[in-house]
A protein has these predicted regions:
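Bergerat-fold GHKL/Histidine-kinase-like ATPase
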Residues: 1-67, 71-80, 87-94, 146-221
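A general structural signal for short secondary-structure junctions and capping/turn motifs
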Residues: 13-16, 46-47, 101-105, 132-134
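Residues in well-ordered beta-strands of folded domains
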Residues: 24-26, 101, 114, 142-144
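Divalent-cation
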Residues: 53, 66-131
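Catalytic "initiation/cleavage/transfer" segments centered on a nucleophilic residue
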Residues: 106-139, 145-171
Length: 221
């Protein structure tokens, strides 16, 4: 997404005067790293919204006024946020992908932390991380439903965790999009005479026919 398109989208979200399933307003940057980590994981583990998440700094979540973060003493840059993620013990070493973008709106700077939508859900830690009295707990699944994050001392409900694993394996996709996902990994396909079937999902089968009219023969890629 271009900077102008992102700016227009953020302005629309501010105009909505509410928070939602994929966006959250913060008047200033997180002072507590555990709170930052918790918010990122919640936004990355969104089972119902198929788009990037936004943590928008410099906008009041009470009045929706653009305050700006140009004088924010707690302001972090992208390198610092990514470094914090890299230093934490995530399951399988897979971490949320983030990007920090600064926008200029109404003579103020606001920072938008973009959390990429991926199929690597659920993201969770394998060891506790503490900053002062706040603890992001190991093996807890945090998520965001509507405009509410899972409490930092709790784990998501069972049906939400199931939805995150379905997203991980592409089980929430329509059949055509799921087929495209399966075709991306040729190693999971077996050949039997004139057809190919997926070893993991054998209900997906490709039947090939020779093109006798032009002398061409099929090749499975």
């Amino acid at each position: 997404m271009s900077g102008n398109n992102l700016k227009m989208e953020i302005l629309d979200l501010i105009s909505s005067r509410q928070e939602g399933s994929y966006w959250d307003f913060k008047q200033e940057h997180h002072k507590n790293t555990a709170n930052l980590l918790h918010d990122i994981i919640c936004m990355a583990n969104n089972p119902l919204c198929n788009q990037d998440g936004y943590i928008i700094y410099g906008v009041s979540d009470k009045t929706w006024q653009i305050i700006g973060i140009e004088n924010d003493s707690s302001r972090r840059n992208q390198e610092h946020i990514i470094s914090q993620l890299k230093s934490k013990s995530f399951a399988a070493g897979i971490r949320p992908i983030v990007r920090l973008i600064t926008l200029h709106i109404n003579e103020h700077e606001i920072d938008v932390l973009v959390i990429k939508n991926t199929m690597d859900t659920p993201y969770y830690l394998t060891s506790d991380f503490r900053d002062k009295q706040r603890v992001v707990r190991a093996n807890h699944i945090y998520t965001r439903v509507s405009d509410v994050n899972t409490d930092i001392d709790k784990s998501a409900d069972k049906h939400i965790v199931e939805a995150l694993w379905k997203k991980h394996f592409g089980l929430n996709l329509n059949p055509f999009d799921r087929l495209k996902l399966l075709l991306a990994d040729k190693s999971n396909w077996e050949t039997s005479e004139d057809q190919h079937y997926n070893k993991i999902c054998p209900e997906f089968t490709l039947c090939l026919e020779d093109d006798d009219d032009n002398g061409l023969y099929p090749e499975f890629y």
